[in-house]
UniProtKB/Swiss-Prot annotation:
Its main location: nucleus. InterPro entries: AcTrfase_ESCO_Znf_dom, ESCO_Acetyltransf_dom. Keywords: Acyltransferase, Cell cycle, Metal-binding, Nucleus, Transferase, Zinc, Zinc-finger. GO terms for biological process: mitotic sister chromatid cohesion. A zinc finger (CCHH-type) spans 80-104. This is N-acetyltransferase ECO1. Residues 1-38 are annotated as: Disordered. Gene3D superfamilies: 3.40.630.30. The keyword Cell cycle applies. Residues 20-31 have a biased composition (Low complexity). Belongs to the acetyltransferase family. ECO subfamily. One of its GO terms (cellular component) is nucleus. It comes from Yarrowia lipolytica (strain CLIB 122 / E 150). The keyword Translocase does not apply.
């Protein structure tokens, strides 16, 4: 037993020389390591060299394309405002030119109108057709009303579920409209001074928007639409002109209202 302990001690002291070049103390013949474990250590040492351990893989940054300027900026002003339709656009930019061409045609001639089940014919002749629609969310109607608000520089109107629009169509283009709604009260306005009276009057129909395309103005379209709305808006009831009021009328709208009604009365939307 003493001899065995001394041998273990001797082998432990010579553990540092296990991987020396001496044949008698090689890993394959060392009594401290099993043969299989020694072979695995040798293969692992051969598989990964110190140079490979120190080597670092450096990734090249991805190349990004520089932004390309589509138009030259030489300090000159390239935008212009059309005196006819009022649109501002870039004269040297193709998409702007196309957009102006489309908008210009729409502003002068009116947008294309496609008859649908949401609109009914209330008047028709050889030259025009008047449609009435209460479905203001219909794409054809809503797009036209957006154009009207843009042309009049007016916000989105506050309307009830009883609102209706009368559209004047010529050659399948909507060239004019009157947007009306049910109201209950109004006030008199002095055209000369712009003073709003304090006294309230009963009213039935409120005119929220009046619009005619540029090429069709001064042809009596708005007057025609107001007359139709006055007799058609409330089923079975012919309204008097003093039962009709207007909201947010422009300078031209005030003149039209005065010529049509004589005395102009106004109301506030949502009241």
């Amino acid at each position: 037993m003493k001899t065995y302990r001394a041998k273990r001690k001797y082998l432990s002291e010579s553990e540092d020389d296990v991987f020396s070049s001496s044949p008698t103390q090689s890993p394959e013949t060392s009594p401290l390591q099993p043969p299989n474990e020694s072979r695995l250590n040798i293969k692992a040492a051969q598989a990964v060299s110190p140079c490979q351990k120190r080597a670092k893989v450096v990734k090249k940054p991805a190349k990004t394309k520089a932004p390309v300027q589509m138009t030259l900026s030489l300090g000159q002003t390239t935008s212009t405002t059309c005196k006819t339709c009022g649109m501002t656009y870039q004269v040297a930019y193709g998409p702007d030119i196309s957009a102006h061409k489309s908008f210009h045609s729409t502003a002068l001639n009116g947008p294309k109108w496609k008859p649908s089940v949401s609109a009914v014919v209330v008047d028709k002749s050889k030259t025009y057709t008047v449609y009435k629609s209460r479905l203001l969310s219909h794409p054809c109607v809503s797009q036209f009303l957006k154009l009207v608000n843009s042309e009049l520089n007016a916000p989105e109107p506050i309307l009830s579920s009883q609102a209706a629009v009368y559209v004047y169509v010529v050659d399948q283009r909507a060239v004019g409209c009157v947007l009306v709604d049910r109201i209950t009260k109004c006030r008199h306005v002095d055209i000369q001074t712009g003073t709003l009276g304090l006294k309230e009057y009963p009213a039935v129909m409120g005119v929220s928007r009046m619009y005619v395309s540029q090429l069709f103005r001064r042809t009596g379209i708005v007057t025609k639409l107001l007359d139709l709305a006055k007799s058609d808006f409330i089923y079975g009831m012919e309204l008097e002109k003093n039962q009709v009021a207007f909201t947010q009328p422009s300078e031209g709208g005030l003149k039209v209202a005065e010529n049509w009604a004589g005395t102009v009365r106004v109301y506030r939307e949502g009241e």
